[in-house]
Amino acid sequence: MIFDKSLLGFIGICCLPPILLLIYLPNVSLQWIIVQSGFFSFGAGLLTYKLIPSVADLTSQANLTGMDLNKKGDPKFSGKKIPESLGICVAVVYLVCVILFQTFQWFSFPETIQLSEYNAALTSICFMILLGFGDDVLNLRWRYKLILPMFASLPLLVAYAGGTTVVVPDINFPVPLREWLGVVFDLGIFYRIYLLMLAIFCTNSINILAGINGLEVGQSVVIATSIIIHNLIELTIASSVPSSSSFSSSALSSVSPHLFSLILMIPFLFTTISLLFYNWYPSRVFVGDTYTYFSGMCFAVVAILCHFSKTLLLFFIPQILNFLYSVPQLFGIIPCPRHRVPKFNPETGKMEAIPTNLTIINLLLMITGPLTERQLCVYLLIFQGLCSCVGFGIRYHHLHHNPTLIFI
């Protein structure tokens, strides 16, 4: 296989910062656990890469195939059927990897394992994999896609052991919020409702921002990388505390959530990168709703159980903007076609915007003019990465003034 240079560059840029942060992590014990998780994840990535062609043959035999709408009229690709629902391969390998490492962790580092969180995470992820594959096969209606994730999220709310308070912004316009509510305000049951809505948003937002070869998987790689970087930064700060040099109870309380998040996100990143090799332009497989729901729930799981749900939203800035821009169509205010992708011009070989399809994909084309599908995907992923940088700036801009804000 000949790898695209832009793809290799993208993967290299995503992988380099976490590797550097891991090298400089002060706590050797944590470092060793993460490295071991990396070995398991690397094996899962290789297995995914090897299995995808075989699973693609199986989905083709089951008539789970589709046409690439962005290549109509292109003599190289026109009429070619592409295997769909390859997210099922990634999801199954991911689950096997996490379960195997959970077993390994139980025997090697029993003091670091979080069984209730593991079980809740795997239950919710499995539910969404089932829903996604069911959608690929049965073509479920949107109302089911909004309702069923609520039930998938219930194990997360049961296992959630974090607080329900928020820091009130120091804003005096239009009203002095802190004078009315105080510095910290307890939302109670409304915070859990917010977590429920977060899970529904995550599972659907990646599915909404889709339709370009490599986009669904590429944005998941960027978000997963951002989460891993965030976790490593938090572990580095927590490890600078003298008591965190070993696995004391006080040290574990600060590092366990982020260690748990890394154990879930590292195999996700490796298996997703393997899928990206096949889904990059020109795509040889389609990921299906199985992958988009699986990836969205993975992000929701770590954000909720590891207590950084507000930080996760900073990494979802493009998805939030796309949702807000799409609201008139999503809620039926104006007609919403089944596929809101741009149109392909076979004469120029470029994608052109359809202004009535309200997505940031079409909005970008309206700003830049026609682009090739590869260029369009690269620009959108660059935007995703820049938004993550903005998110890190917002998240950590107070760190040099007050290091305790890092744990909010």
UniProtKB/Swiss-Prot annotation:
Its EC number is 2.7.8.15. Dolichyl phosphate binds at K145, I200, F201, C202, T203, N204, S205, I206, N207, I208. It is found in: Endoplasmic reticulum membrane. GO terms for cellular component: endoplasmic reticulum membrane; membrane. Inhibited by natural nucleoside antibiotic tunicamycin, which acts as a structural analog and competitor of UDP-GlcNAc. It is a multi-pass membrane protein. CDD domains: GT_GPT_euk (cd06855). Its cofactor is Mg(2+). It catalyses: a di-trans,poly-cis-dolichyl phosphate + UDP-N-acetyl-alpha-D-glucosamine = an N-acetyl-alpha-D-glucosaminyl-diphospho-di-trans,poly-cis-dolichol + UMP. Signal peptide: none annotated. The keyword Transmembrane helix applies. Belongs to the glycosyltransferase 4 family. This is UDP-N-acetylglucosamine--dolichyl-phosphate N-acetylglucosaminephosphotransferase. It comes from Dictyostelium discoideum (Social amoeba).
